[in-house]
């Protein structure tokens, strides 16, 4: 029996703060994927790999992927819930060297075989970062309203997105663009001071070269 079985899901203390962080990483992956996956392949590294069972990190990651938050009592039965929902879970530790000691790689597969792969890290103090999305470098913290575009790298897209946001008086706090190469695939991550309205999201989707647009609320 692990510590989580004894104390339960109340999020207090540094040990259970780690559970909350793991749930946030799983939730962020779920929000980016925008649907419940049919399969989740999870690899934990570093400290996560050494303590993921006894500390409840495994259940927290699965809970987040299922859309269950750290303060939800269902977290402790996340594996059973995944089975009920017919979500296949494969979780393995790895001793491979990584840049950060608390790292997890999550690969989600949907009903249409669409795949999302993210790399997330725990920074301590309850903070997380998603540092890779489908092979792209990324910086996602879950602390802001976020707009993400998946698009073809071509002139004018960044300007048009910025203009559409300005027309709705949406203030941009940060904007980062990552691309696989010139005139190739690109991801733009925009943190805003407020939620981007649905009509603006639909307008951005119509921009030539934009493949997908998603919005993420603060966790």
Regions found by a protein language model. Give the residues of each.
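A conserved regulatory-domain signal marking ACT and ACT-like small-molecule sensing domains
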Residues: 77, 89-94, 118-219
């Amino acid at each position: 029996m692990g510590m989580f079985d004894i104390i339960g899901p109340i999020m207090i203390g540094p040990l259970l703060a780690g559970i909350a962080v793991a749930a946030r990483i799983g939730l962020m992956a779920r929000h980016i994927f925008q649907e419940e996956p049919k399969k989740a392949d999870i690899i934990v590294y570093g400290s996560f790999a050494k303590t993921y069972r006894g500390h409840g990190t495994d259940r927290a990651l699965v809970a987040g992927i299922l859309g269950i938050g750290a303060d939800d009592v269902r977290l402790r039965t996340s594996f059973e819930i995944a089975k009920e929902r017919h979500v296949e879970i494969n979780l393995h530790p790895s001793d491979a060297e990584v840049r950060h000691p608390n790292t997890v790689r999550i690969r989600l597969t949907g009903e249409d075989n669409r795949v999302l792969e993210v790399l997330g890290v725990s920074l301590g103090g309850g903070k997380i970062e998603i540092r890779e999305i489908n092979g792209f470098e990324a910086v996602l913290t879950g602390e802001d309203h976020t707009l993400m575009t998946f698009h073809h790298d071509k002139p004018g897209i960044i300007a048009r997105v910025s203009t559409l946001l300005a027309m709705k008086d949406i203030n941009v706090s940060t904007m980062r663009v990552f691309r696989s190469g010139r005139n190739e695939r690109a991801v733009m991550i925009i943190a805003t001071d407020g939620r981007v309205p649905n009509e603006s999201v639909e307008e951005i989707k119509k921009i030539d070269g934009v493949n997908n647009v998603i919005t993420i609320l603060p966790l």
